[in-house]
């Protein structure tokens, strides 16, 4: 996109030093990045598509062209890019780790690592006076200077011991890890500059309104963990893992949680009764069960948060819900004292979200490992889902509150099959295909959350029993082709010849909210892939194909390509599909007739926008010599 750019500089340093033979080793791995970018303004592509081609880029006097009376309120996209070209950010990041490794005797190892990830971002965003036809900011000039800082550090200490006695082989591991993250940001804003250049436009040079913002937060995580692996004759395999994590995002009552896991394996081909099957190289049964935790919520989720909200007014109803109060009786004169508004209700009892997963699988290879593959079934259940619930009205202001409530399950199969060999004329090949299924279901949620649309259902129906993010909508049942069809249909506000007909599901003679049904499922019936590797003499070719079958997508593009009334703004550029819109001379079209107003509410969620998202694409192709 014109007047945007992106530059990145990277430097890397790695080193390892053996101080005492193989007993003591130290090392470090660090990377330094510098990124500088001018990003495209938000929505610039949409603006360029929307603005009518009849509006020139430049007016006859050389100034920027723009809409005039009666034309839509869209800015000149070329002017937007010009005024955006100085809005640059610079981002520095240094990350890496240093370690000490101690091997006191055979099989025993202790390693301690300290990791650091520090980032700093500086940016300035300029507002220049502009006049583009009727679009103007009335000579306003301003700048916002922003600083953002992120600091993450990690320290761990891990001890391992390996031992092998005859057919018995095993290893144990124990360790702990500390993590800390701190983020802060602040910005200064100033208006009215006498010189409109980036070198001059710093907040101190402005003479108008000044504002400052800033905040900071962080969290800590401590983990203790251990693992034991054991195998007998490489035939029977056992692995046990236990970890305990504590996060500052949770209250003292539930800050820590324990997550165990176990896995078992049986390599059947190592049994004596399988020795005669020489064509079977490897056959392994495996099963595992384990738990993991999730703490990805706001750092302030457990706190009750109060904030001043001075002089805020509802832009629609005009009702003031600000926190200013005339304590002194000045009848509104001057600046009033401000109280505080509760923005979040605290909950010191929120705890870790837990996922319990069970896997059962089989791995195999045959004919000197030419034919190989695996089959696996998994079942995953997530409980104590962390979610925000709207505050109860009797508690007063407060909005949302973080809670643990709800459960969700995921299950599916994964199958992988490959074949590799070499032909008589020297072509080496390896073909590997995979297919997987995945089903998801919301098992339980609080009633207010299940029906508010956050997990799916569009706020119309409870999503419990359905797929996460599945949607409810109307069933588009073709186009009204005659007045007789309109008259014989259920009462539908806005119904007319050439308009979309919606199905009366409950047969009550009225198209209303009760006629919505589950119409969108974002999970595919199955997904698949194919890896191809070919090698001949000094040439090699690699390809990766990926496909998804039986998945729904919602095409929001249709709201612009199929409706003249999109965004309720006339005179915007439209999609060429409208050239095939319904008309008396084009009665078989599936695109509704042209109209300047959406009286039939055809932009409502409906099957008209739901399409089959199945695809097969070539993800990667590489030829080497």
State each model region's role.
Residues 224-242:
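Short, contiguous hydrophobic alpha-helices characteristic of membrane insertion segments
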Residues 108-110, 114, 434-436, 530, ...:
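P-loop NTPase catalytic cores that bind/hydrolyze ATP
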